[in-house]
Amino acid sequence: MMGKLPLGVVSPYVKMSSGGCSDPLKFYATSYCTAYGREEFKPRLGSHVGTGYKSNYRPLVSYQPHLDTLDNPAIGQQIRDTSKSVTSQSYSPLEVPDGKQPLPWNLHQTTSSYGREKLNPGPHSKEVRKVHFDTQDHGPQTITGLEPKEVPLIHQQQGKGSTEWENSHYGPRFMTSEYNSKYIKESPNHPDLLLKKTIGSKEETGFTEESTKNPIVFQPPSQAFPGDPVLHPGRSITKSDYLPVTHPQGSDFLPVLSRGSDRDTGFSRVNERTLNPRVPTPAPQPASMSHRSYQPPQRMQQTNVALLGRESVGNKEPTGFTLNNPSYVRSSYEQDRDQRYLTTYNQGYFENIPKGLDREGWTRGGIQPQKAGAYALSELNNHTLMDSTPNPTETLRHLHPHVGRTLASVDPFYRDMPHSSRYPASS
């Protein structure tokens, strides 16, 4: 029989509490949740209040234009369009003419480009003639007094391509571009027989006439045999050397080696190209290098000194590198035997690895006992907690009374062990 749990001292926190929470999602109940929490709580929607800039605005909604007609008409005219935005004033909706607009004063009225669109956006000829006059119709030959303009030398423009020099210093012609009036000439219909011009056959330019003599692609005939694909610049060397694979048809000759021929490799068939055709061709050389290398030993032709017996071959002696070095025999009695052949690399980069018994480290003497770490020192009852089975009753005694009652109300099987005498096994 388990004893009664300690209730503890009654505190204002316990008095204000509404008891343990039965919701498993609220296992870690806080003081605020137990004191002020309510089930199905929904926050109330507050009213939106304007910021401090709201008082700076003029109440345009309640403003009427007739309020300033008597009191302050000047201010009424200034703030007449304050309620309209710039976008609504500039981008007004499309207005279609309904026939109530007044007639224009002039039939050829000039409007801006931002006005009502016209079918013909170009200017009318009558409007152009008011500003410009055609020198072909009203030039110096037609109207007296319109002679070519003479500009003083000081005011003349020295730059090339000036439009004021065209058409007798009257500017470009009427409704023509600068290019048409300056550079395009009318070709005569009748042939000019007096100039005695003859037109020959069409020839290639310098860029294409000598294209076959390109030093990169073209080679002179002396550098290649007739029929060599190098002579054809349009054909690449890759296509001429790497031909497609051809399967045997059955009519090919069998690979038979003729009697008395050299077993040369495929590299021996080399066509040597003469750089200078005037130089005579050298004597035929053996084609294969392996044929000369792998030959049986032959007796060399003796010289006159060898025939007279004046040539002698001595014993083989060591070279200067081995003759100057004494015989290296390591003696166990030498103290500096390791320093005898000490190089610069060994002096600068020596080995700091311990040798002998110092190299064994922790493995010397068998397995070392484990030392307690920071985690083991901070937990005094580490072995007791890991070995023993947790007791719910002892856990409730060490907890806060309110937390203990909450655990007992949420889980009724938490207090006693499942296999205790309180829960007998069913037979």
From Swiss-Prot:
The keyword Cytoplasm applies. Disulfide bonds: none annotated. Coiled coil: none annotated. It is found in: Cell projection, Cilium; Cytoplasm; Cytoplasm, Cytoskeleton, Flagellum axoneme. One of its GO terms (molecular function) is phosphatase binding. Residues 82-105, 273-298, 314-335 are annotated as: Disordered. This is Stabilizer of axonemal microtubules 4. The lineage of its organism: Eukaryota, Metazoa, Chordata, Craniata, Vertebrata. The gene is Saxo4.
